[in-house]
């Protein structure tokens, strides 16, 4: 592989990983909008939730995430250890995720009594290149473990969202 080919590969892998890091930064910063969703996901994209339910298409992804994340005062997603494999105009991605969620009914001041939950897992994604831009076409979240308050509420929320 030539140096130019190596540089192109590094740039494309960075473009793909940026899709996830920028998307979840928008979620955590509470500035998610439909333009960010459309810049991240393809028109037929699927998000597969931990319970197996799916959101398909940018509008459904946007509405589903706005509804889901409205339950939290704050979230913080740490996404690491990206492995990206590119084959022509398709790619796969694997990364680890630690997701922190502070329930909306908490006080504004930090407290030892705050209700929260943490989830660790693995993101598995597929991406496609549309024109010159990479977009996520599928994103799954395999939760390895969870801890904290409100796990029953989370499971009930996903059941009601189906």
Protein language model features and the residues they cover:
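Alpha-helical protein-protein interaction elements
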Residues: 15-16, 33, 57, 61-64, ...
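Short secondary-structure boundary micro-motifs
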Residues: 8-10, 29-31, 37-38, 66-69, ...
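A short, hydrophobic secondary-structure junction motif
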Residues: 15, 19, 23, 42-52, ...
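Short, low-complexity N-terminal intrinsically disordered segments enriched in polar/charged residues
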Residues: 1-39
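A beta-strand edge to alpha-helix "cap/lid" segment located at domain peripheries
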Residues: 4, 70-81, 85-162
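Generic, low-specificity signal for short hydrophobic/alpha-helical stretches with a mild N-terminal bias
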Residues: 2-5, 19, 43, 47, ...
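A short linear-motif detector with a strong N-terminal bias
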Residues: 3-5, 18, 25-27, 55-57, ...
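A solvent-exposed, acidic/Ser-Thr-rich amphipathic alpha-helical stretch
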Residues: 33-101
């Amino acid at each position: 592989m030539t140096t130019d080919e190596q540089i192109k590969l590094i740039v494309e892998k960075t473009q793909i990983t940026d899709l996830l890091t920028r998307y979840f930064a928008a979620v955590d910063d509470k500035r998610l909008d439909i333009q960010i969703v459309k810049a991240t996901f393809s028109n037929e994209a699927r998000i597969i939730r931990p319970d197996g339910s799916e959101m398909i298409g940018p509008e459904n992804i946007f509405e589903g995430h706005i509804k889901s994340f409205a339950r939290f005062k704050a979230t913080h997603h740490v996404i690491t250890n990206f492995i990206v494999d590119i084959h022509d105009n398709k790619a796969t991605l694997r990364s680890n995720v630690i997701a922190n969620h502070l329930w909306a009914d908490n006080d504004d001041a930090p407290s030892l009594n705050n209700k929260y939950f943490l989830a660790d897992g693995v993101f598995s994604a597929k991406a496609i290149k549309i024109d010159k831009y990479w977009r996520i076409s599928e994103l799954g979240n395999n939760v390895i473990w969870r801890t904290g308050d409100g796990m029953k509420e989370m499971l009930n929320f996903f059941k009601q969202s189906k």
